[in-house]
């Protein structure tokens, strides 16, 4: 099941792309070196795990970490004039309250990573998902890192799905980290359909991986397994093998091991369930998914799978949004 590692011509970003920062992700890998990574924290166990992952991204991949902590104003009955005044105070960052909050957040994160951090930090007011997306745009983030916990029906009723909403609105990849994870992933399940989005997601997974990672290219076959003739099954299998080989070639660089697997799901089983079950069986510590398509049907399909992966909350998830630009 292991595909050979191959070297590819895309292993590094060209100088012009690095300077411009605007080349489509399908043409260049995601490289975090020297680029902003936004860590969103609320002090929860999963957010502190995300802080440890962000610290590892800075240490091992030379990312430049920025921090945002959002004071959620949704549940506070703040009159519009006062809300505007607080927002102005937030924007100028001059209040002692903000400075005290920043000191508290910095101390909390320093305790989580085991050393004093000097990352740029902002405490802002607003709806968490919208504020995080705005801050990511403000700092030019190549990646957002957030904590990820399990979401139930009550969370949806109360509109308390910050991580999922960030993934739906952000213009860059979003890495959701579960509380049990404190290091960069080493065995990554990359959900693929062999489209351009698959290459984007696999490359993004590589960009956040630890040293000598294994990328498990995973295709979920929605057919029931029956074929008109045996030859049709052979042709289908050969096509899948060619697709896996091409992805490995396009992403390949030194230090990566590629595995691949085809999952056959029962009619009653969703794509997300099949991916999660295999991730548990194979010991994968990250699931990646993504698309660069923007049609209505594509958004619905990709959105439903991503939503299920995020709401389940038992595996860290990297979602690459349907955008053409990195």
Per-region residue spans from a language model:
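Structural beta-alpha unit
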Residues: 1-33, 46, 53, 72-75, ...
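Small/aliphatic-rich secondary-structure junction motif
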Residues: 7-9, 18-19, 24-90, 116, ...
